[in-house]
Structure formats: C-alpha cells, structure tokens
C-alpha cells in the first residue's frame, strides 16, 4: 500500500529535486498535486522549480559535501535528479546510507557519463551505436579523429543541451573544438567522445516508464535540434511499426539492465531498417514537453507516479501534437516580460518557465498545440511562438 503524508506536517512525504529548471518545475507541480512536500535545489537563485516548491536551496551541485549537507538537512524520502551537473559519487554514498535516489544512483552515474553508457550499450548489451573513440588530451584527440575520420562530432563525456559539442570537418578545427569541450563541459574531467557522423532518416525520443505494473512505452516523439539544443518536438512521429517495435525492444533491454523506477528518454537515429542508439536520460526529457498536451499523463506525471510505486495503467495519446520553444535571442537582463500572449489559438497552451535572467540566448517557454496532422500542428505552434514578444 502506497502512503503519502501531507506536506508541511511532521511526517510529510518529501521529494527533493536536484536541478530546478523547467523540467524540475513540472515535476514539482506533479508532486504538489499529490500533496507532497517539495524541496528544489540548484546552483542559482529563483530557478523555475523554486517558484512552485515549499523550500529551496542554492548550492554547488558538483560539490559532494554540499550535496550531502543539503540532503542530510532535509531528509527527503525521494531524491530526484533533473540535470547532469551533479556529484554522482555523493549520490552513490547517500544511497548506501539509505536514501532513495530516483531511479538509482548507479543508473544516474552511468547515464550521466557518455563513456560509461556508450561502452555498456555497445559492448555489454551488443546494441548498435555510431562508431566512436575517446580522448583525454589534445594529442590523443588528433590521433583518434584520424581513426574515426571527418566529419565527426566531439562531445565532453559529461555535458547536456549541446554544451561543449562541435562538428569538425578537418584537422584545423581540432584545437578550437578541444578548447570548447574543456570550457563548456559540465565537469573538469577533460575526456571527450569522438563520434562518427552517420546518415539517418530521422531521430526519435522513446519515453519508457519502468513501474510496478511493468514497462510502458509512449508513442515515438520526433524532434529537431539546433547546435544540440531542442527547438521543437511532435508526437506521434510517423514510422514503420516494425522499426518502432525494434526500438521498444532495444529500450527495454537497456532500461531493464539499468533498473530503477522512473521515466527514461531513449534517443535513437533511424536509418532505413536500422535503429541506432544515441543517448539515454533517466528522467523526463526536454523533447517530452509535448506530452503536456499530447497524453492523459505527461512524462512528468509518469515519472512521479512510477517512483512513488503507483501503477501506470494505460497511457492514452490524444493525437497529433507539437511543442515549439519560445526563445530569447540576443537579450540581456533580469527583467524579462512576455507580451502578445493573447495570440494563442484554440487547442494551444503556453508554458512560461520563469527563468530569472537571460544572457544572449535562452529557452524561456513553449507553445503546445494539437491538430488533425503533425504538419498543421507544428506550423501553428511555430507561428504562435514567433508572435510572442520578449523584452528585458
């Protein structure tokens, strides 16, 4: 029997969210709907999830001492990482001391490190990936890129949202790419992964829910990125059912090995009849924002239900839906305002993230849309997003 103790009472059920961005905000809202006490944590003040939490803390998320101090102060029942920039060694130690890490400290540790997850998937689980090499110095990078060939993609082994990544076409670009990876990676580990750029027809995110009543799959989500950063997504993505079943089978194999209750976002490249593994996130995925309008249970509701050990049942998808980001570009300041919001059409919704400032470019919200076809839905959502006026 699952018991939830009311927030702010002496015996309250507490969830601590490590990372308080727009994804953490939606997780916090789902917890609030269930009367759970929410504590959000991030490295900066006034992060989105902090607006809808009972309490918050601002700490260095990569400092294991600060992570442990914060958690031992609050004694949460569930610790829910929402970002990559976290001391995973601290989480492993905390789990050994009895804390419940979602989905598990081992899973967080493996999936936040591109080297660990790529070797696991390709070598241990024998799943198809793009060709890759690793390098921990500039001299080694020069050698390994010759093995992979040009063009290739260079990424820090720990980063997200395209940070520190670059596509290089010749040896002259190596120095800049290496320096970028060292500057913008999430930690100072220094190591990078070099990936062969492969042809593909499209890429998808497959949301997989591991729960007490089995493993559940959302319909495939298509998405478009720029410089590794999500711009728009849609559900369902049209694809051959045989290929979809193959993606589900691969996802199940990976998630079953990793273990733990929660939602996983598995990214694939699809080329002809090949399903090629790209990455996996053990938490709600930014491309999954579309599920706020496309499903009876969003990815955030699914995540919370699963780690609380509540049954998921049947996930219903409502038809062609899309999500398009509202971006601030070449803007600076901490007084962000949005106008012309009344341009939103029927069957559309808006989410404004409430990020406290902007320094050049930043995702600040999304337009959610439903229509008879994906093409119509995307077209409408992009048109509406372009009409939202942002000032600082």
UniProtKB/Swiss-Prot annotation:
Pathway: Purine metabolism; IMP biosynthesis via de novo pathway; N(2)-formyl-N(1)-(5-phospho-D-ribosyl)glycinamide from N(1)-(5-phospho-D-ribosyl)glycinamide (formate route): step 1/1
Database matches in InterPro entries: ATP-grasp, ATP-grasp_carboxylate-amine, ATP_grasp_subdomain_1, PreATP-grasp_dom_sf, PurT, PurT/PurK_preATP-grasp, PurT_C
Gene Ontology CC: one annotated term: cytosol
GO biological process: 'de novo' IMP biosynthetic process
Chain sites annotated for binding N(1)-(5-phospho-beta-D-ribosyl)glycinamide: 22-23, 82, 286, 355, 362-363
Domain of life: Bacteria
Family: Belongs to the PurK/PurT family.
HAMAP family for the chain: PurT
NCBIfam families linked: PRK09288.1, purT
Entry protein name: Formate-dependent phosphoribosylglycinamide formyltransferase
Taxonomic source organism: Wigglesworthia glossinidia brevipalpis
Gene name of this polypeptide: purT
